[in-house]
A protein has these predicted regions:
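Active-site loop segments of alpha/beta catalytic cores
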Residues: 24-59, 66, 71, 82-86, ...
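Glycine-rich loop at the start of a catalytic domain that most often binds anionic cofactors/ligands
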Residues: 64-69, 94-101
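Short N-terminal amphipathic alpha-helices
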Residues: 77-95
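A charged helix-plus-loop insertion that forms the helical arch/lid used to bind
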Residues: 102-109, 161-162
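Short, positively charged and aromatic/hydrophobic N-terminal segments
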Residues: 3-13, 17-24
């Protein structure tokens, strides 16, 4: 039995976990890995083994509609995942914001806005098929990410993020109007997501890069909106995982965010797992493996197994979910992901 820190939260105590998957490892142990296992780890409760969570963006032709639903179902069938993050590629619309003053023109979103309708349809259909088996996470693109999508579209973030920051500095009042509209729209989205059957939220936060926004800009403008959304997402039936994306992050900006679990890139010039345990004390950590290089992407089964064993020893006694810095390459061999998941069973204590 793995003993973790106790966190005083009660999530879905009356939830029925109807499907349990028993996984035999090479040393004869049998471990139950179900939705409750994932929830218990996130709450810091005792579990038999460490769960794992990995995800990647599907090809463009599988971003929406029937193809997107089938891509999630095929992945769940191909890899016996402990948790499935539903990849929502329907973003806030791009095209109307060209300069700082344009933010004042941004009109409120509604529950019928296409990006909300499309995301909710995908989640409902995936949850209808998988809801009794896997821990299902809804992806929420955070306020800074959504502002960027409206301003520039989904691509070239590193090249264009400073241009977005410049609109904040040029006309803060206009930017705040746009930010309020975006935050209200995400609030509607989160509320609708709770009707789909998901069990938790994966909030993808951008904007914490130390070399982009100042601490004052972040704390005064971005942080209050994110804390509002995280508080709205987190309730007795839904946990919240905070993903802090990109490199050169000032992670202290997120230390008091209301969430149950955290994930960041330890291979991206950010703090280590050990340092993160101190900064995010009491929160479950997901991560440990490089998402773009290293053993998970390029290694052999034996190399992956050794690295997972090292991570489990490093995180012994702390609530931990094996994962990667961020999304994996779309073309990563499924056998590599399977090897990492199987290694958590083999080295369970």
């Amino acid at each position: 039995m793995l003993n973790f820190l106790k966190i005083p939260i009660d999530i879905a105590s009356n939830t029925s976990y109807t499907i349990t998957r028993k996984i035999n490892n090479e040393i004869g142990g049998i471990y139950d890995v179900d939705r409750k296992t994932v929830t218990n780890v996130i709450l810091g409760k005792e579990v038999d083994c460490v769960p794992a969570g990995f995800w990647f963006h599907f090809p463009a032709e599988q971003h929406s509609g029937d193809a997107a639903v089938q891509a999630h179902l095929d992945l769940a069938k191909a890899i016996d995942l402990d948790m499935l993050k539903i990849m929502t590629e329907s973003l806030m619309p791009y095209g109307d914001i060209r300069c700082a003053a344009d933010w004042k023109k941004l009109k409120p979103f509604t529950r019928q806005s296409p990006f909300i309708v499309e995301q909710i349809d995908l989640m409902k259909r995936v949850c209808d098929k998988l809801g009794d088996d896997k821990a299902l996470l809804a992806t929420v693109h955070g306020v800074w990410a959504s502002m960027f999508h409206i301003f520039n579209g989904p691509d070239c973030y590193e090249e264009r993020r400073d241009a977005l920051a410049a609109t904040l500095r040029e006309d803060r009042d206009a930017f705040r109007h746009g930010l309020d509209v975006v935050t209200d729209g995400l609030s509607l989205l989160i509320d609708e997501m709770k009707t789909t059957g998901i069990h938790g939220f994966y909030y993808a936060a951008l904007g914490g890069e130390a070399n982009m926004l100042s601490r004052e800009e972040f704390d005064e403008v971005i942080k209050p909106c994110e804390i509002r959304l995280l508080r709205e997402a987190k309730d007795e039936n839904h946990f919240v995982m905070l993903h802090m994306c990109k490199d050169h992050l000032d992670l202290t900006r997120y230390a008091d965010y209301p969430c149950d679990a955290v994930n960041w890139g330890i291979y991206s010039d950010n703090i280590s797992l050990e340092e993160g345990r101190k900064l995010f004390a009491g929160k479950t950590i997901l991560g440990g493996l490089d998402d773009r290089d290293g053993v998970l992407v390029h290694g052999t089964k034996e190399q992956i197994e050794r690295r997972v064993a090292e991570l489990m020893d490093e995180m012994k006694g702390y609530p931990f979910i094996l994962g990667a810095d961020c999304t994996l390459p779309t073309d990563i061999p499924y056998d590599n992901i399977r090897a990492a998941i199987e290694a958590t069973r083999k080295h369970a204590r």
